[in-house]
Amino acid sequence: MVNSKQKGNSGERAIVKILNEFYNTNEFKRVPMSGAFSTIHKNNLTESEAHVFQGDIITPDFFEWVIEVKNVKDVNLYKIFTDCGHTKWDEQLEKERENIKNKKGVILVFKQNNREWLCKVFKKDFTIEVVPRMEFVDSYILLFSDLLNFYLNNK
């Protein structure tokens, strides 16, 4: 049986590696204990510390979004499509968006076993046109690699 915490941690490490290689840096890092850290310690964090511990990945100043990572056994894309792009993580993403400091928005990066990394971005967080795999009223779902290539090429 797979430990879901270990699976989540391995997903976060994979995204950190992808981002560091893509941007030729080592500034992307996992948030210690991921989302649990800021939940447990949020009252003891200064505003600048809280800024660093947004999402699952610590991002450099040049990177404009908070990143949430989900590495799961199954992703029901049919359900996402028939629910107008909504995922089971949307409530968490909206809470994250409400607390964002110094970033444009949230990117949900998710992966099903043995598949490529996908991502969900909200249209209100992007002022540029993204070429999506799926487009919905309020969001896009696309390959994470497409988002990186688009973002880097249109910065």
Locate each region found by the language model.
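Catalytic phosphate/metal-binding cores of nucleic-acid and nucleotide-processing enzymes, i.e., regions
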Residues: 1-155
